[in-house]
């Protein structure tokens, strides 16, 4: 590890104990105001950056259409649903995740909420994340129209 990177957190960090709360509500990005938005679900500390001038939400891993909630640091689908409901109230047109090379329309949030609602009591398929840090869980595929929407959870209900 090079000296400047000693403070970096490796993926799979032991207990994620060295992550702290981001304590700034907004920042100016060269005459463009940005707001920090909490997006818990994928992880407790997930945040997004809302850029009102662009009507865009940068969501990191929190709003991927295949919602991954099966690692030790992931939260429940109930928490994910609350986040989706909050996001639904925001005034944006598109969002960008960290795992895709395209913007998604806000309308996809509705389908993600329906996916969680539909998943209760439905058939899930065994799932195993194929590389370290490996995690097992269950996959529910809700729909495959324009963009596939699904849910991966650690335990079925």
Where are these regions (language model features)?
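Metallo-beta-lactamase
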Residues: 1-38, 43, 53, 79-93
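Short, basic/glycine-rich phosphate-binding loops at helix/coil junctions
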Residues: 3-6, 60-64
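Short acidic loop-to-beta-strand element that houses the catalytic metal-binding Asp/Glu
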Residues: 26, 46-50, 62
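Active-site metal-binding loops of divalent metal-dependent hydrolases
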Residues: 41-43, 55, 60-62, 98-100
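A short acidic, helix-capping loop that chelates divalent metal ions and anchors anionic groups
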Residues: 66-71
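Charged helix-capping and loop-helix junction motifs
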Residues: 73-82, 112-116
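Accessory terminal helices/loops
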Residues: 85-94, 101-157
């Amino acid at each position: 590890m090079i000296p400047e990177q000693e403070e970096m957190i490796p993926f799979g960090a032991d207990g994620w104990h060295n992550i702290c709360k981001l304590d700034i509500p907004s920042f100016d990005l060269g005459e463009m105001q940005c707001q920090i938005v909490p997006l818990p679900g994928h992880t407790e500390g997930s945040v997004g950056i809302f850029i009102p001038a662009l009507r865009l939400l940068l969501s990191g891993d929190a709003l991927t259409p295949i919602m991954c909630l099966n690692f030790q640091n992931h939260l429940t689908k109930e928490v994910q649903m609350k986040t989706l409901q909050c996001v639904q109230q925001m005034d944006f047109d598109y969002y960008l995740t960290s795992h895709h090379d395209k913007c998604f329309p806000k309308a996809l949030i509705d389908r993600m909420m329906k996916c969680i609602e539909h998943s209760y009591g439905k058939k899930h398929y065994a799932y195993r994340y194929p590389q370290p840090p490996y995690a097992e869980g269950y996959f529910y595929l809700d729909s495959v129209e324009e963009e596939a929407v699904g849910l991966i959870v650690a335990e079925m209900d």
